[in-house]
Amino acid sequence: MTRVFPRYRMTCALPLAVGVVALPERCQWVPWHHSWIDSHAMTIYESFVYEPDALVYPNLANRTGCQMLMRSICDTQGFCAGATWLLAIDGVYVGTVQGVVEDDGIGLIQNVGIVPGHRRSGFGIALIGKALHGLHAAGAKTGQLDVTVGNVAAIRLYLKLGFTIDKTIYRTVAIKAKRDRVVVGALPAVTEPREGRRSNP
């Protein structure tokens, strides 16, 4: 049995002016360093484990999967350290974002995650702004992200920031019943006829 999840591919021209978000003094930006890879992974996990995207991308539903995902991102050609950030409050990580610049100048924003309990505080906008700045500084001309169609709040935010919906892509996930449990596994994403790229949530 399979389930198909529609996702919007959203893009923006760079540079994109994102309004300055006044963060509390207790907040700290933590730039990328390889030693923070597990901190990014755990923040991704805490941000997405109970969200619908954990069905779309099963790796998000467990810590090991998030570690594998984060290692895959930072090993990707075009990984953008300047677009990869942790946000901490009093030394506790509450937000994460990663970036990749492709050869054609597309800057991919990946895994914009805010830990529950710290949302609706402007942290998402701040993370996106940091990522876009880093992608542009690395040579990206266009910013791109994917968002699940049902994530209305995120879509509204991205539209407000200046992103536009470029196309709809479809991700098919295999769902297998096993003893009263549901086991999910991702199948290759498919897109509408127009050729496109795939990025993580």
Name each model-derived stretch.
Residues 1-5, 125, 150-167, 175:
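Conserved active-site alpha-helix within GNAT-family acetyltransferase domains
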Residues 1-34, 172:
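Acyl-donor-binding surface of acyltransferase catalytic domains
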Residues 28-42, 48-53:
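A short beta-loop-alpha structural element at the N-terminal edge
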Residues 59-90, 96:
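Active-site rim helix/loop that mediates acceptor-substrate recognition in acyltransferases
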Residues 84-86, 92-101, 108-113:
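Conserved beta-strand in the GNAT
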Residues 114, 120-137, 156-160:
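Conserved acetyl-CoA-binding loop-helix of GNAT-fold acetyltransferases
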Residues 135-146:
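Conserved GNAT acetyl-CoA-binding A-motif
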